[in-house]
Amino acid sequence: MSLAKSAANKLDWAKVISSLRITGSTATQLSSFKKRNDEARRQLLELQSQPTEVDFSHYRSVLKNTSVIDKIESYVKQYKPVKIDASKQLQVIESFEKHAMTNAKETESLVSKELKDLQSTLDNIQSARPFDELTVDDLTKIKPEIDAKVEEMVKKGKWDVPGYKDRFGNLNVM
């Protein structure tokens, strides 16, 4: 137990979040857990620093009704702390941990898949021929519908591309 306390005290939460590159709901949940942990630790230290002994003789000298003091003193002497079964809370924590790990693994797989896709896109961009070196045959090989559209326009006697003059202006000299 002392080893766990020592490790918990030495844990640098900011470093954990940044070094593991945790983001999103996982980082939010981890930060809220840290906040609750710090608050509980602060309350524990505050309660431990308070005195636990009651000076009943002082109250007997101050109050006239000492029978009340005797009764309270007997209750205090009879008091035994109750041991609480923390297994339910531990089960909740374990289920939360499993859920968090599942979310983290899903996030990791999504990120790695996206990185692979981005890397392949980057490789395609870097290995592509410059635009000025492309030929019409290259374009029709990539998009065969271009060739079909041009053939259809020639059959119908349309020699102008729709919207070309609107976009680029009329380049006729005459």
From Swiss-Prot:
Modified residues (N-acetylserine): 2
InterPro entries with a match to the protein in the record: ATP_synth_F0_dsu_mt, ATP_synth_F0_dsu_sf_mt
GO MF term (any one): proton transmembrane transporter activity
Keywords per UniProt: Acetylation, ATP synthesis, CF(0), Hydrogen ion transport, Ion transport, Membrane, Mitochondrion, Mitochondrion inner membrane, Transport
Principal location: mitochondrion
The protein's role, per its UniProt record: Mitochondrial membrane ATP synthase (F(1)F(0) ATP synthase or Complex V) produces ATP from ADP in the presence of a proton gradient across the membrane which is generated by electron transport complexes of the respiratory chain. F-type ATPases consist of two structural domains, F(1) - containing the extramembraneous catalytic core, and F(0) - containing the membrane proton channel, linked together by a central stalk and a peripheral stalk. During catalysis, ATP synthesis in the catalytic domain of F(1) is coupled via a rotary mechanism of the central stalk subunits to proton translocation.
Other observations noted: Present with 6820 molecules/cell in log phase SD medium.
UniProt-recorded name of the protein: ATP synthase subunit d, mitochondrial
